[in-house]
Amino acid sequence: MDAVTPKKDIPRPDSVRRPSQQEAEEAVRTLIAWAGDDPAREGLIDTPKRVVNAYKEWFEGYGEDPVKYLSRTFEDVQGYDDIVMLRNIEVESHCEHHIAPFIGKAFIAYKPSTAVVGISKLARVVEIFAKRLQTQETMTAQICDAITESLAPMGTAVFIEAEHQCMSTRGVHHKHVTTITTQFTGVFKSDADLRNRFLNMCGQTV
């Protein structure tokens, strides 16, 4: 079967002016005061700096290009003709609506056309998109698009299951509810048996 024609461009965040460290810390002080506490008291005096440094780590995906990690491929696969799959990739992201964490697992697979990529690079792509303000639906599509664009495989499959703290710690306060999102291209979309095999390997009964 022919390889999937990759998309030309993967959506990336628009360019925005990045505030200085001082401006970001001042914004945190404002939120602390708005919450009803004194940002100048001993226990909170260094909190703005700590919060900004945590944001640097949580959202470092904005400074990374996922395609770069998928650019080095290997064509010597010794006749391998099946899917390549990574299971149980840790996902730690933040929803763009409340900046609340959502945490779960990603499962990704592709059926190579002519080349494969180092497996750690696939996990890195998941991490890059997770370390941005996200919706789970968008992140699922972005991961799938990045693999499809870079590797032009015969098909790509992405499955993510996560628990959203914007639902478990606020609002309706429903704990232990998970959200599942999937995206399929190529042979995973056209071949129900292959798609079901992937889902079974994700722990889903189909």
Swiss-Prot record:
Q: Which GO terms describe its molecular function?
A: GTP binding; GTP cyclohydrolase I activity; zinc ion binding
User: What are the EC numbers?
Assistant: 3.5.4.16
Which species is this record about?
Hyphomonas neptunium (strain ATCC 15444)
Sorted UniProt keywords: GTP-binding, Hydrolase, Metal-binding, Nucleotide-binding, One-carbon metabolism, Zinc
Q: Where does Zn(2+) bind?
A: 95, 98, 166
Q: Which Gene3D superfamilies match?
A: 1.10.286.10, 3.30.1130.10
- What's the family? Belongs to the GTP cyclohydrolase I family.
Q: Which domain of life is it from?
A: Bacteria
Region called Disordered, residue ranges: 1-23
Record-level GO BP terms: one-carbon metabolic process; tetrahydrobiopterin biosynthetic process; tetrahydrofolate biosynthetic process
Its UniProt entry gives the catalysed reaction(s) as: GTP + H2O = 7,8-dihydroneopterin 3'-triphosphate + formate + H(+)
Q: Entry's NCBIfam families? A: folE (TIGR00063), PRK09347.1-2 (NF006825), PRK09347.1-3 (NF006826)
| Basic and acidic residues compositional bias, start-end | 1-17
Question: Which protein, by its recorded name, is this?
Answer: GTP cyclohydrolase 1
The top EC class is hydrolase
Pfam families assigned to the protein according to its UniProt record, in alphabetical order: GTP_cyclohydroI (PF01227)
Recorded metabolic or biological pathway in which this protein acts: Cofactor biosynthesis; 7,8-dihydroneopterin triphosphate biosynthesis; 7,8-dihydroneopterin triphosphate from GTP: step 1/1
UniProt gene name = folE
Q: Can you name a GO cellular component term? A: cytoplasm
Subunit structure, per the record? Toroid-shaped homodecamer, composed of two pentamers of five dimers.
